[in-house]
Structure formats: structure tokens, C-alpha cells
């Protein structure tokens, strides 16, 4: 299959938990994307995270006033982008690993608490099929309000060819 065929090949625009677990190495308690409800190949994704009191970070952050740590919100955005790139590359016959490299312009605007449903919207700012460094813009949205936003960079690692 050549690159032109890959661009027009059938692309599944959603990802359930089983597909996410095939793409990401993360597992409980660190898998922070429940499903992806929309993807545009190599361009954007909309993930969902159902925030529950059963998550271990709420035991200490903060007793009596559980608030999702900002770093976990950013990680959920990064995982959503990894699902986007991993699924896009897999549909192009390339398995990849995606590693978080840097974060810029991060802002937290609203508390995220147990019971919230977080929409994780990520868009590719820079990156192309076969490229090793990608940059994303991410927003975590709760009840139509931006809870957090950030720009972040990821490195794509391609498996070594068999000798």
C-alpha cells in the first residue's frame, strides 16, 4: 500500500476502551481516556474522561474537597493525542509509541471534580505522517467551560525494523 492509498484508506473515527488499550501502554490507575468519540486522521480527536471519586489521587488531593490534579488533566490530553497519532499511524500500517516531551502555555481555568465528564479536545498544530515530533493544542472542557488548556509536544518512536 503506498502513501496515497493510506490517505484514502478506511479510518475508524472512534475508539472504544479496547482500541485505546491496544494503542496506549497505560492501565489503571493511569489510563485517563475512557473513549474517543471523534477523530480526523492525523488532525484532531475528541476524547471523554468520566471523573469518578474512586480514582486514587482523590484520596489526598484534597481530603474533604476532591479536585483532579492539573497534571492528570494534562496527561489525559496527552493520552488523547497519543490515541490520535497511534491510531492514525496504525491505519497506515505503522505501529508507534508516543512520548510526552514538553508542555507550554498551560492554564487551569476551572476545577475538575468527581462526577464531571471531561471532554478532551486535541488538535495537531505541527506533525505529519512519518514525522517524529508533533505539537498539539489541547483543551479539557467540562459543562461547556474550558477547565484547562495547553500546547504540548510529543515524540513518535517507530519500532526497529527486524534484522
UniProtKB/Swiss-Prot annotation:
Active-site residues per Swiss-Prot or TrEMBL entry: 61
EC number annotated for this UniProt entry: 4.2.1.59
The job of this chain, per UniProt, is described as: Involved in unsaturated fatty acids biosynthesis. Catalyzes the dehydration of short chain beta-hydroxyacyl-ACPs and long chain saturated and unsaturated beta-hydroxyacyl-ACPs.
**Primary localisation category:** cytoplasm
Catalysed reaction(s) here are:
a (3R)-hydroxyacyl-[ACP] = a (2E)-enoyl-[ACP] + H2O
Q: Per its record, how is this protein called by name?
A: 3-hydroxyacyl-[acyl-carrier-protein] dehydratase FabZ
Q: Which InterPro entries match?
A: FabA_FabZ, FabZ, HotDog_dom_sf
The gene name on file is fabZ
